[in-house]
Amino acid sequence: MHIRLATESDVPAILSLIHALAVYEREPDAVQLGEAELRRDGFGTQPLFECLIADDEGEAAGFALYFPIYSTWRGPSIHLADLFVQPSHRSRGIGKALLERVAAIAMERGCGRLQWDVLDWNTPAIDFYRSRGAVMLESWRIMRVTGAALARLAKSSSPGT
């Protein structure tokens, strides 16, 4: 098994892993993008994300999808959107290797922070992250606007402001 940067040819495997993660996270119908969007957003002229693949003899055993963000407190940072290992490949250090590689990339890029979200019921993941030095920010909550609410909010904007 080795960790490598994903290429455009990995898009079908990445999408499959995203769907598997959605099932694990109890939201099997939440994924609304397809291969075309992943190709455009990750492998186009201005990539919005990067992805690592845990390659086990040609099989995508897991992945880590991340992107740059900016912290007004810490400067350049990375947000880890997804970290997932196929159930058949767990307990072999793959998740640890993926997380460590993303952390190394953050350090190489001079980032002051690596952050991600975790579901409150996902105690195996919480324990895994805590065992690697992560701290749960109990007082922070995620706010999100999607779909019609996003369109309404955008429509409220005055031109030129």
Residues of each region from the PLM?
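Conserved N-terminal entry element of GNAT/NAT acetyltransferase domains
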Residues: 1-9, 150-161
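Residue-level recognition of the GNAT/N-acetyltransferase active site
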Residues: 81, 86, 119
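Acyl-donor-binding surface of acyltransferase catalytic domains
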Residues: 130, 139-150, 154
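Conserved acetyl-CoA-binding loop-helix of GNAT-fold acetyltransferases
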Residues: 85, 91-104, 131
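Acetyl-CoA-dependent GNAT
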Residues: 5-12, 16-79, 99-100, 105, ...
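Conserved beta-strand-loop-alpha-helix junction that forms the acyl-donor binding cleft
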Residues: 116-125, 144-148
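Conserved active-site tyrosine of GNAT-family acetyltransferases
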Residues: 66, 129-130
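Conserved GNAT acetyl-CoA-binding A-motif
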Residues: 107-117
